[in-house]
């Protein structure tokens, strides 16, 4: 029975998988995202940035798994970044940064890139790995100053790419989404299904081995 390991501490990604019938093992990577990004060239594309980060996370998680889990499992890690006018926006980390991001985003459209990396382990060996990036266009609304400050004060925006959520309070300020909504939350179900299939794993098998109880 192949266990699915979510290499992420993201509550949003965990929620997406559980709502889709899979209760994964959770193992946060601890990768220093700033350090990895600093090692990339300034001309690195958004797709390559998130793909590199997703692979770094998945690789670290896979290497730290117990022998019992690594005997038969698949690791998936993701990374998301919002791009507006070629500038990437990650997690704001502070209210001041989140406010600045929203001032740049309000009333505009941005592209959310989410890198996905899947590593298949069998008998404690990597038998397959693949990474790919999905992109979704998001049209942001124009929250009033009062609404924006209330949203920033709740803290939700600080630890999510772009400083917003679709499935939380930030959903009030998203006017439209063009593409896969689950990608906006942090893990794209269509792309994940495709990557698992390439690793020889069906969604039916994942449901059976990782049931939500």
From Swiss-Prot:
The keyword Oxidoreductase does not apply. The keyword Cytoplasm applies. It catalyses: a ribonucleoside 5'-triphosphate + H2O = a ribonucleoside 5'-phosphate + diphosphate + H(+); a 2'-deoxyribonucleoside 5'-triphosphate + H2O = a 2'-deoxyribonucleoside 5'-phosphate + diphosphate + H(+). One of its GO terms (cellular component) is cytoplasm. Keywords: Cytoplasm, Hydrolase, Nucleotide metabolism. Its main location: cytoplasm. Pfam families: Maf. Its EC number is 3.6.1.9. GO terms for biological process: nucleotide metabolic process. Gene3D superfamilies: 3.90.950.10. GO terms for molecular function: nucleoside triphosphate diphosphatase activity. It is found in: Cytoplasm. Nucleoside triphosphate pyrophosphatase. May have a dual role in cell division arrest and in preventing the incorporation of modified nucleotides into cellular nucleic acids. Belongs to the Maf family. HAMAP family: Maf. This is Nucleoside triphosphate pyrophosphatase. It comes from Mycobacterium leprae (strain TN).
